[in-house]
Every structure is written in C-alpha cells, then in structure tokens.
Amino acid sequence: LEPTYPIVFFDAIRVKIRDEGSVKSQAIHIALGVRHDGCKEVLGLWVEPNEGAKFWLRVMNELKSRGTNDILIAVVDGLQGFPDAINAVFPDAMVQTCIVHVLRNSLDFLSWKDRKPVATVLKNIYRATNAEQAEKALTAFEASPWGQKYAAVGQIWRRQWAQIIPFFAFGPDVRKMIYTTNAIEALSAPLLTPRAAFTHHIDVTK
C-alpha cells in the first residue's frame, strides 16, 4: 500500500450470498483510498457479520502492517467508536462522518410526508459557509417547529458534531469529495444488482 493516503473512505455494503440453498444478506466492508495522483484504490475487502469498533481497529492495524503510515482524512459512517479506532492507529487522521449517512438516519425518524421539507431545512447546516454558521443553522432548526416535533433529529447531529464539522475547513471541491462515502456505493454498484447473488463470500472479493 501507499505510505500516505490523502483520503480513505470506509463503509459497508450488503450483498446476497447463497448458503445451503438459501440466499442471505452479508455485509462486505470496504476501504477505498484516494492516492496523491487522484486515483482510487481498493485497500481491502472484509467479510464480517457485525460492524463494530473492534473490527475496524483490526482493519486499521492491518492497513498499517501493509505499509500505510498515515491517513489524512478518513470518511466514515456514524458508527460509535469508529473515530477512536482510526485515531488509535493513525493519530493524526482527521475523521469526517459521512453527511449523507447522518441525513438518512435523521429522515428515518420522520413521517414520509415530512421528509422532503425537513431535508430542505437540514441543507442549511451542511451547506453553511463555515462551522460557526453551520452550528447556528442547527440551533435554528432545533428551535423551529420541525426541530420541536422531531427533537431526535437535532440530537443525532449534536452527538456526531465533532466529526460532522471537519470538512468546513476545506473549499467546495474538497467538501464535495469528502462529505459522503458514495464513492464506495458507486464502486460496489455491480454487486448490488437484483440478479447478483454469490455462492460464497470469497466470490465477492474476487
């Protein structure tokens, strides 16, 4: 592996695997690195039943043992303990929570008819010009009728705030790159077609 990666995306996808006559959903965890030349490189695929901080700590140690000494920006989902797992091995890495994950989790609390208007209001947070303006937008949302109706949404953003705001330190081009782990979803799209089902988890990694 490269000694340093400017950006590494960490996420999981679910694929269908045939097992003893039945088809089961299996999590495949992916690390996708962006090299200094801008090219993307799959750093590893791991099959693990449960995504947890201990598992990701093992992944970080594996990347370190394979030659990577530093990650500048790690883009992750909102798993509790994930930032600690990364910084335990790469202490200088900036951990950025995927804004799209936070948004999706927020909308899960809403009735269907309320999702579009609330999503529009939440854009004021992650499209703010800087972290200070973003926090003002979050506070305004919490005080609004929507925020009062769905207090859990504001709590989701508050809990992950330290990992939400790092991308405000960068310009629009970099922000667009790191605010989501969709690069992994695009990479894995062929695995997620309705007809795709693998006979063994090893087939997925080939």
Specify the residue positions occupied by each region the protein language model found.
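Amphipathic alpha-helical transducer elements in NTP-driven molecular machines
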Residues: 7, 25, 50-57, 76-83, ...
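A detector of single, family-specific signature residues
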Residues: 36, 46-56, 61-65, 110-117, ...
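Hydrophobic alpha-helical scaffolding
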Residues: 46-49, 72, 76, 93, ...
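Conserved beta-strand -> loop -> alpha-helix junction used to position metal-binding or nucleic-acid-contacting
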Residues: 73-80, 85-123
